[in-house]
Amino acid sequence: MVVRSTAAPPTPWSKDLAEPKIHESAYVHSFSNLIGDVTVCEHVLISPGTSIRADEGAPFHIGAATNIQDGVVIHGLEQGRVVGADGHDYSVWIGDRSCITHMALVHGPAYIGNDCFVGFRSTVFNARIGDGCVIMMHALVQDVDIPPGKYVPSGAVITNQQQVERLSNVTEADRAFAKQVVEINEALREVSPGATNNGSRIAANQQPTPSSSTNTSGTSEHQSVGNMSLNGDLYNQVRGLAAQGCTFTAEYANKRRFKTKSWLSAGFVEGHSADQIIGNLNRVLADHAGEYVQLIAVAPNSKSRAAEIVVQRPGDSAPVQTSTTASYSNNGNRSNGTSAGSQAAAVGGDLTSQIHALASQGCSFTAEHANTRRFKTQSWLSAGFVEGHSAEQIITNVNGLLGQYPNEYVQVIAVDPHSKFRVAELIVQRPGETGTLSTKATASARRSGNKVVNTASGGDVAGQIAALASQGCSFTAEHASTRRFKTQSWLGAGFVEGHSANQILANIQAIAAQFPNEYVQLIAVDPNSKTRAAEIIIQRPGNNAPVQTATATSSFSGGTKAAPSSNGFGGHSSGSLSGDVVSKVRSLLMQGYKIGTEHADKRRFRVKSWSSCGTIDSTQEAEVLRHLEGCLQEHSGEYVRMIGVDEAAKRRVLEEIIQRP
């Protein structure tokens, strides 16, 4: 038998209680409980699961545009009052535009001023909080009077006035955090199916006041979140999250799905810098015009959502603003690969460099296609495997698929060879786009003008250097003639000063001008280990020198095509070594690591059964390279991988395939 109970059980004080006075524009969820003499002013938001009981201590006042979030409890003692801003006595006074967040407890007598923020699970009892104060999470504020504009940190216990005197002032970052929490919660104003503008859940022993009608006020959305795509803070948020290594995805929903939080995936938002991410996000906004779109930031370690930002709502048309700083390129203009107004994503050099990087990690590739209707529901159809042992072959085969599915969406899927999970989803064609992926995204750019060579995407270079600079890396430069470059005998060119990517790029360009017709590379040095974090060649005397970089994604040329004998993975069937392998050998030797090799035929490679070729005892770079080339020739037609070993820790620090059949 079902046991039924009232929404708010009667108490000894609940007889002959006054009725709540709720403004017609207030937004009170039907799953919240209001009892007694409670004044709810205009544009107040009261979320589900709140309990506001003015039965023992009364009255309560909740000021205009105040936000009461899920699970908040507001109660008062029978004795004890505070003087409100209007000069009358109240058990609990909450001022205008304040925010009481999830699971917080406000127990009267208590006074909370205007523009205040009370964090998750914090408690305010017998206290007076001045205007503009910010109380963070799990804090206790009791028996004190806090002056305006003070900051109470998370977990603080403030129970005497001496502790109050030591509190710091609120900063802009604190206000920005409070604003973000309020904006996200206020989305309930237009999405919750159980809410009405003034339909509060009154206790069973009370009748609603005549003013509590069920008609919808035209001002119900007055405090809803605006078009965040027009907010310049979004760019700073994305830049900060990207600097933390977060990856980004997007989701969209129509009005019906938005009400039930049934978001549909819009895929990954690719990019190495905030400009690239915002540019790709603008494409998503254009694809889902008239719908809700939110950007998801995923933490790299916990794989959990670090942020959810609604960037578009129905009726919004302006694109997300990007940084006004132009990306670095050798002709002073913004690279077509990152321009928001570029043609197909397929012609973007950024996609080409990403495929190069993924191929160098040994990923396998598949393709999917969808028409406009299927794209909206993410119902992709398989287009089969994309064959190829090198990035150039893969790109060529992808271009063939683009011709098979004109006026459709086409995306390339990169699959990790070990975990068999998708590591990237790249949309390379959209309806109305006719471009193709280029294997030489900036070859023409490098032939003209000055000698400074940038990547397939100038913004990518700035993004890489910005990321390295944000990690605290310092930068130096080296140069070498053609003869010295062959033996990797670089000469120092001094430190590269600068506090931003643009300053560093400008200074390295000035250094490159001092050494015309020579190789110049930029070195990023890790501040903790004092080892090289990246090596980026930015100038070459001609177009025949091999691309060399310490990481798979930091090649400055980005479009150099492998020689016909190259297998596309850093090794050559002829027994010669690529510049990338030479660079990594040099880096391993500089850090004191030993280098060894292993080989496997096709059958053994499938089951990961490698045979050791032994460790190279020498620490001389030339001798190690000679041993590696000999190993490649000895095991021609087989897989060969290079091993970096830390003998002190007895562990491998590098495993890289340098030859494939």
From Swiss-Prot:
Region named RbcS-like repeat 2, SSUL2: 350-431
SMART domains referenced in this protein's UniProt entry, alphabetically: RuBisCO_small (SM00961)
Compositional bias per record (Polar residues), positions renumbered to this chain: 194-204, 319-342
PTM section of the record: Identified as 2 proteins of 70 and 46 kDa in gels. They are probably the result of alternative translation initiation.
Short name of one Pfam family: RuBisCO_small
SUPFAM superfamilies xref list: RuBisCO, small subunit, Trimeric LpxA-like enzymes
Subcellular location field: Carboxysome
Role: Functions as a scaffold protein for the assembly of beta-carboxysomes, initiates carboxysome assembly by coalescing RuBisCO (ribulose bisphosphate carboxylase, rbcL-rbcS). Produced as a full-length and a shorter form; both forms are required for correct carboxysome assembly and growth. Beta-carboxysome assembly initiates when soluble RuBisCO is condensed into a liquid matrix in a pre-carboxysome by the RbcS-like domains of probably both forms of CcmM. CcmN interacts with the N-terminus of full length CcmM, and then recruits the shell proteins (CcmK) via CcmN's encapsulation peptide. Shell formation requires both CcmK proteins and CcmO. CcmL caps the otherwise elongated carboxysome. Once fully encapsulated carboxysomes are formed, they migrate within the cell probably via interactions with the cytoskeleton.
Family the entry assigns: Belongs to the gamma-class carbonic anhydrase family.
Protein name: Carboxysome assembly protein CcmM
Protein's organism: Picosynechococcus sp. (strain ATCC 27264 / PCC 7002 / PR-6) (Agmenellum quadruplicatum)
